Swiss-Prot record:
It comes from Debaryomyces hansenii (strain ATCC 36239 / CBS 767 / BCRC 21394 / JCM 1990 / NBRC 0083 / IGC 2968) (Yeast). GO terms for cellular component: endoplasmic reticulum membrane; glycosylphosphatidylinositol-mannosyltransferase I complex. The lineage of its organism: Eukaryota, Fungi, Dikarya, Ascomycota, Saccharomycotina. The gene is PBN1. This is Protein PBN1. Belongs to the PIGX family. One of its GO terms (molecular function) is mannosyltransferase activity. Glycans are attached at N172, N277, N339.
Length: 450
């Protein structure tokens, strides 16, 4: 039996007139543009060499309580199973690639090590195969419109799979009983008059459609409960732009924000999270003084060209002072030469800027049905403790474009001539050295005659 929990947020001020029909077999809502989350708990075959796996496809953003803010695109995290005999690397990657091959085009050596986890990120990716896989897992019972760029999260914890979908609801929101599913539907709105940022009050209805319960007499229940959000929205804003500077561009960010002051907060610090594709890197020795701490995972070899690196790139988390403007120096790696253009245009995600705040009564965060924190994945969340809440500043940018200079294919001829001259020079130097030795050391026979 598959467990399905559907949460539907009513954007109006009242639930009156929202439900058009309800009984023990179905629920029909009026046609309103709802935001919706489906959570499925599935029993699937266990992996032999994978301990935990989290796939996050982030395409849809909203400030609704249903949504957590992560870096846009595809984020995949995987922990290998380590037994008494250690870690079987070959078998682990065979099992991981067997699953990934049917969903995403990820090279075996494209992952980076991040803390104790393998991590892969791609800002934009073809998601059709993954969405089709999700349709099959859920038996097409989702109430989220999968045609309108949904967020999808697949989590394998070693025992079961938890699948979360959120985004816009289907145009015709009618949920029916299914003998293979235990369904719980919540229709909620926020009681704004008695809610605050750190204490949100939800009121509404719960509908139970148990597939194996013929009577199902208590299918409709009124409900009201409090939610303490981990992911919160700051009133602050920021904007980023790239200042071209040849192979060493600057990522400039203007920040307009005040430190949060909700009642449950203890202390707050401002953070800057950035992922960079393998065309760029940050040199920790050239960080401006505004960045007071620094964590970087990925290939940190500063000399390798882009085409010699297999990993997707790197992720960076930094604490920053409350400056109004910061400028992060980036370094471009040498690109593969091309005769058609002397510039390669590539994109990076806009950084995420947020306050990380220690909070009182942190146990209330974990009791929220919408808390998305796990011990694997979640971009920046992994670097913070369980008692941290996040206040996200708003930005209108998603992708930033950067021009990288590159040579043309005549560089091969130049390299050949350069190497030839270098070899000739080395040969000449050795020739002169040997010649000098023979001049200083005449033969023994010559010395005897003298």
């Amino acid at each position: 039996m598959i467990r399905q929990r559907t949460t539907i947020f009513n954007p109006t001020k009242s639930n009156d007139g929202i439900i058009e029909a309800v009984d023990s077999s179905h629920l029909q809502l009026s046609s309103i543009d709802y935001q919706c989350e489906d959570k499925f708990i599935l029993q699937t075959p266990k992996f032999k060499y994978i301990d935990k796996l989290r796939i996050q496809l982030n395409q849809f953003h909203s400030e609704s309580i249903l949504f957590s803010k992560y870096q846009a695109g595809l984020n995949i995290y995987c922990k290998p199973k380590i037994g008494d005999e250690g870690f079987n690397q070959e078998e682990f990657f065979n099992e991981l690639n067997q699953m990934m091959t049917n969903l995403f085009d990820i090279p075996r050596d494209g992952w980076i090590n991040s803390l104790d986890t393998l991590f892969y990120h791609e800002p934009s990716t073809g998601s059709e195969s993954f969405i089709e896989y999700v349709r099959k897992l859920t038996g097409n019972e989702s109430n989220v419109n999968l045609e309108v760029s949904p967020n999808i999260e697949y989590v394998y914890d070693g025992e079961k799979v938890v699948l979360k979908l959120n985004g816009k609801s289907l145009a015709n929101t009618t949920i029916t009983k299914n003998s293979k599913f235990n369904k719980e539907i919540g229709l909620f709105l926020i009681e704004k008059g008695i809610s605050s940022e750190d204490d949100i009050v939800l009121s509404g209805l719960r509908v139970i459609l148990n597939g194996d319960d013929d009577k199902n007499e208590e299918y409709l229940q009124k409900t009201l409960f409090h939610v303490k959000r981990r992911q919160r929205q700051s009133r602050g804003t920021y904007s980023s732009q790239v200042k071209e500077n040849g192979m060493h561009p600057f990522l400039k960010t203007d920040i307009h924000s005040d430190i949060p002051n909700d009642e449950d907060l203890i202390q707050c610090k401002l953070y800057y999270y950035l992922d960079l594709n393998k065309s760029f890197f940050v040199d920790k020795y050239q960080l401006p003084k505004e960045f007071t701490s620094y964590v970087n995972f990925g290939n940190t070899d500063l000399e390798l060209p882009e085409y010699k690196i297999n990993e997707w790139g790197s992720e960076i988390l930094m604490e920053i002072e409350n400056n109004q403007q910061i400028s992060l120096p980036l370094h471009s790696r040498y690109q593969l030469p091309n005769n058609e253009s002397s510039i390669r245009v590539t994109g990076i995600n806009d950084p995420l800027i947020f306050y990380g705040c220690d909070v009182k009564d942190s146990y209330l965060l974990e009791s929220s049905p919408f808390d998305n924190r796990l011990d694997i994945g979640g971009n920046y969340e992994r670097f913070f403790t369980d008692n941290t809440v996040f206040y996200h500043l708003s930005s209108h940018e998603n992708q930033l474009q950067i021009n990288i200079p590159r040579g043309n294919e005549s560089i091969k001829k130049i390299n050949f001539v350069t190497n030839l001259i270098f070899i000739a020079g080395v040969v000449l130097i050795f020739y002169k050295i040997v010649q000098g030795i023979f001049k200083r050391n005449p033969s023994a026979g010559t010395r005897k005659n003298e």
